[in-house]
UniProtKB/Swiss-Prot annotation:
GO cellular component: cytoplasm
Name used for this protein in its record: Imidazole glycerol phosphate synthase subunit HisH
Keywords: Amino-acid biosynthesis, Cytoplasm, Glutamine amidotransferase, Histidine biosynthesis, Hydrolase, Lyase
Entries under CDD domains matching the protein: GATase1_IGP_Synthase (cd01748)
Catalytic activity: 5-[(5-phospho-1-deoxy-D-ribulos-1-ylimino)methylamino]-1-(5-phospho-beta-D-ribosyl)imidazole-4-carboxamide + L-glutamine = D-erythro-1-(imidazol-4-yl)glycerol 3-phosphate + 5-amino-1-(5-phospho-beta-D-ribosyl)imidazole-4-carboxamide + L-glutamate + H(+); L-glutamine + H2O = L-glutamate + NH4(+)
Quaternary data: Heterodimer of HisH and HisF.
Name of a matching Pfam family: GATase
Catalytic residue positions: C81 (nucleophile), H183, E185
SUPFAM superfamilies the record matches: Class I glutamine amidotransferase-like
Compartment list: Cytoplasm
Annotated pathway: Amino-acid biosynthesis; L-histidine biosynthesis; L-histidine from 5-phospho-alpha-D-ribose 1-diphosphate: step 5/9
Domain Glutamine amidotransferase type-1: 3-202
Organism this protein belongs to: Lactococcus lactis subsp. lactis (strain IL1403)
Amino acid sequence: MKKIVIIDYNIGNLQSVQAAFLRLGQETVISRDLEEIRKADALILPGVGAFPTAMNNLKKFNLIELIQERAAAGIPILGICLGMQVLFEKGYEIEERQGLGLLKGEVIPIKTNEKIPHMGWNQLNLAKASPTTHYLSDNDEVYFVHSYQATCPDDELIAYTTYGEVKIPAIVGKNNVIGCQFHPEKSGEIGRKVLKAFLEEI
C-alpha cells in the first residue's frame, strides 16, 4: 500500500481527512516528522484558519523547504482549503505573506456583496480535463468554508464555482500539485470521488 502522510502543522482537523481516506480503504499517517514526510509516496496538506498562521507553523516545523523539495521531486501533493491557499506564491490575509510558491497566483479576499464567509454547498464548473475530475461532472456540489480565494492562471484552473458575481477557483493544479478550496472530506460522495481520483494518480 502506498504511504500517504497527512502533514500535521497544528492547523485544521486532520482526523476528518484521515477518516475520509480510510473510507476508501487507504491508510494514512498524520505526522510532522521530516523523515516520514521524505519517505511518503504522497502528501496531504489540510488547513483551517489564517494564511499567516499556516506559514508560521510550516516554518516552525521546518516544513517549507521539505514540501518544496518533495514537490520538485514529483511527489503528489494535495492541499485542502487553507492547505490549498498556501500552495500559491502570496497571500493577503491579515498581512502580505509569501506562500509555498508551488502554484502561480495569490490569495485575496472574496470581493462580493454576498455573505462572507462563503459557507455551504456550491456547484462545480469544470474548466479543463484533469485526472482529479475524472469522476466529476458539471454542477456536482461540494462543501466550502472560506473568506479568501485564490487567483490563478487559466492553465492551472481545473474547476471553479461562482458566488454572487465572483468566479472562485475550486480545484487548481499543475503536474503533481493539486489544491481543493472546498473540503472533500465534508463533501459526501463527490468529495469521495475527488480523493479516489487523487489516490489513483499516486
